[in-house]
């Protein structure tokens, strides 16, 4: 037996003892944050002795960005990776530059991987140019495109020899727009790696221990696995040790699998029950633990609530969106969307499905050839057919011009196939095979769709192995439908295009009643370059003649501008459109007297561009992926905007 009387008395006395509020406060702080005290002895906090707080980039950051830098460094040191997922327009590039400066101060080589269209966002800050506000920091990081990962010969646009580059020497890799790697390595074939796998094998796993900082305002596209694939770059595809370090009850693969299952159930709930709070209650604690420990994600509301806005300046107020639903044509008895859809629904698109017409005795021969990657020959064909069907509907929603051009290209593909079959029938063919399973050119497919066909390739099918008579019959039936549709939409010219006329009306109203004083700028987004060409041709003439406005077009195929003095280059055009945010007078003083009022663009500028001089954005078509819409809004809804409100 052991006498515990004294211990009990002491405990009761301590419970009833009067303690100073300060002591209670400190004890509470200790209980909440004690685990972080271990960090001090584990070398995962920023090393203040490096003097990174004296750098130019650090002193250009707002307080919320400085907090992000410190958190990112801690997460990189602790978990080897971090996703900076602040909302669009909150300055992720500058935050990342401060992290880069810290690691360069530690003599780490740094690689920045970015989309080609965003190269100027990065090469400005490591170059000796007049518009580099942090030139004194002498940043030395390398810049490569995402696509350079797949190249084995030649030099990068920045002059790096890709065949001799020491990929494994980088201590830090910064991936801008990391959601482009969200599909992971699942689509790779046995003999060819995709970009994700090349990044993992050549850069991250090889050589020195590499830390990975990922930047994306939209790391999740439509499934939680998108986030998991990006985080896998940080744990090198080996989740076991990472799960232990995060102190998860389940391994990280299970965490994301469960989260996706929960989300799927939540998405099927009635609308009144499908709330954010309901989803949060359904997800398990491990999922939130992962998010908390390896991501930094703040919204505009978070910044407004927890930081001094007098230093940052107010964000522009978002006016309620204005939806417009114009008809296809101003002519009352013209064809409508429903009638076109019924015609499209009758198409078999047999021209893209030749393997469906193989003789049964020949099917095994082509099954062995396969389609590459995880796609069989038939699966590849089915994918192309579905993409073409979707593409027709998306282009119809975009503009009657884009739809008509697509029909004409489709008809040409059908006519070419019919000629090939006829030559085979008459014995005039120089070759007797048709190409199967490849994406056709000239259809402006979304990059997400093209990525699915990144590996593998087309297969040649001999006509003698096919029931080419049935194939010819079905192609001919489709061609008849396409000809009918072309005839029906050809009457809808720009003077009868209700959607185009509605856009011109919006521009006129904006100019006559600006939402901010003297601001006449309008940014128009479309998913297709054909639509952008069509809009530029018609809107620029209207804007110039009737409103005295200058107009420009920016697509992946090139630029154009009504101001002949402005070079048809993206950066020059955007500098004249948004001269304050793009520092036009410093970057291009020869263009200081030229201003552009309207820019019509594809999604080639929906990421990473600072265009906040503009206060009015029009989605001429709605991209199927809502993430793209968020990115479009982020071009004008940004920190540092001088506009009181945006539309």
Show which residues each predicted segment covers:
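Conserved Walker A/P-loop ATP-binding site and its immediately adjacent core
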Residues: 95-98, 106-129, 219-226, 526-533
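ATP-dependent helicase/translocase motor core
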Residues: 1-87, 94-106, 124, 168, ...
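A short beta-strand element within the Helicase C-terminal
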Residues: 226-229, 610-621, 646
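Conserved Helicase C-terminal RecA-like lobe
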Residues: 41-61, 313-331, 336, 345-595
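Inter-lobe coupling linker of SF2 helicases/translocases
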Residues: 143-173, 177-180, 185-210, 214-219, ...
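Conserved helix-turn-beta segment of the N-terminal RecA-like "Helicase ATP-binding" lobe
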Residues: 117-141, 234-238, 538-546
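Conserved segment of the helicase C-terminal RecA-like domain
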Residues: 635-647
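Conserved two-lobed SF2 helicase motor
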Residues: 139-156, 168-171, 576-607
């Amino acid at each position: 037996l052991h006498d515990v009387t004294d211990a009990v008395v002491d405990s009761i006395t301590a419970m009833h003892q009067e303690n100073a509020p300060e002591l209670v406060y400190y004890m509470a702080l200790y209980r909440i944050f004690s685990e972080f005290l271990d960090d001090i002895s584990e070398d995962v906090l920023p090393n203040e002795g490096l003097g990174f707080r004296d750098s130019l980039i650090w002193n250009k950051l707002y307080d919320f960005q400085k907090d992000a830098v410190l958190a990112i460094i801690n997460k990189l040191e602790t978990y080897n990776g971090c996703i900076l997922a602040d909302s669009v327009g909150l300055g992720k590039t500058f935050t990342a530059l401060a992290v880069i400066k810290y690691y360069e101060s530690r003599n780490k080589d740094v690689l920045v991987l970015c989309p080609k269209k965003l190269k100027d966002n990065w090469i400005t800050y490591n170059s000796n140019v007049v518009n580099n506000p942090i030139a004194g920091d002498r940043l030395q990081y390398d810049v490569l495109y995402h696509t350079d990962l797949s190249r084995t010969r030649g030099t990068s646009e920045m002059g790096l020899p890709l065949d001799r580059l020491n990929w494994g020497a980088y201590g830090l890799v910064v991936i801008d727009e990391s959601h482009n790697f969200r599909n992971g390595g699942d689509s790779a074939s046995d003999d060819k790696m995709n970009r994700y796998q090349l990044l993992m094998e050549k850069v991250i796993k090889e050589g020195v221990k590499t830390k990975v900082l990922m930047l994306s305002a939209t790391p999740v596209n439509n499934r939680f696995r998108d986030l998991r694939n990006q985080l896998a770059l940080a744990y090198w595809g080996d989740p076991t040790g990472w799960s232990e370090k995060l102190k998860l009850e389940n391994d990280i693969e299970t965490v994301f699998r469960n989260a996706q299952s929960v989300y799927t159930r939540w998405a099927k709930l009635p609308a009144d029950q499908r709330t954010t709070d309901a989803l949060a209650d359904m997800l398990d604690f491990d999922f939130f633990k992962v998010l908390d420990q390896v991501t930094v994600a703040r919204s505009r509301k978070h910044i407004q609530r927890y930081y001094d806005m007098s230093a940052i300046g107010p964000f522009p107020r978002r006016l309620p969106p204005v939806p417009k639903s114009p008809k296809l044509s101003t002519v009352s008895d013209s064809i409508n969307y429903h009638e076109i859809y019924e015609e499209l629904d009758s198409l078999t698109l047999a021209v893209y499905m030749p393997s469906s017409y193989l003789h049964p005795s020949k099917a095994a021969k082509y099954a062995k050839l396969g389609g590459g990657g995880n796609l069989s020959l038939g699966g590849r064909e089915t994918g192309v057919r579905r993409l073409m069907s979707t593409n027709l509907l998306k282009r119809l929603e975009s503009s009657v011009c884009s739809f008509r051009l697509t029909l004409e290209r489709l008809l040409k593909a059908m006519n070419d196939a019919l000629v090939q079959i006829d030559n085979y029938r008459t014995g005039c063919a120089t070759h007797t095979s048709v190409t199967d399973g490849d994406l056709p050119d000239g259809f402006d497919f979304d990059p997400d769709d093209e990525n699915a066909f990144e590996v593998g390739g087309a297969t040649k099918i001999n006509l003698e192995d096919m029931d080419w008579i049935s194939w010819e019959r079905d192609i001919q039936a489709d061609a008849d439908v396409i000809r009918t549709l072309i005839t029906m939409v050809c009457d809808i010219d720009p003077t009868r295009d209700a959607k185009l006329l509605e856009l011109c009306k919006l521009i006129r109203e904006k100019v006559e009643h600006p939402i901010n004083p003297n601001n006449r700028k309008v940014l128009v987004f479309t998913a297709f370059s054909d639509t952008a060409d069509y809009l530029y041709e018609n809107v620029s003439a209207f804007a110039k003649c009737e409103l005295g406005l200058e107009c420009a077009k920016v697509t992946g195929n090139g630029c154009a501008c009504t101001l002949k003095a402005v070079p048809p280059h993206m950066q020059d055009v955007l500098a004249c459109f948004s001269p304050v945010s793009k520092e036009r007078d410093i970057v291009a003083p020869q263009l200081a007297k030229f201003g552009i009022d309207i820019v019509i663009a594809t999604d080639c500028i929906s990421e990473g561009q600072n265009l906040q001089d503009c206060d009015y954005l029009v989605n001429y078509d709605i991209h199927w992926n809502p993430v793209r819409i968020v990115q479009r809004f982020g071009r004008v809804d940004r920190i540092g905007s001088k506009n009181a409100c945006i539309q």
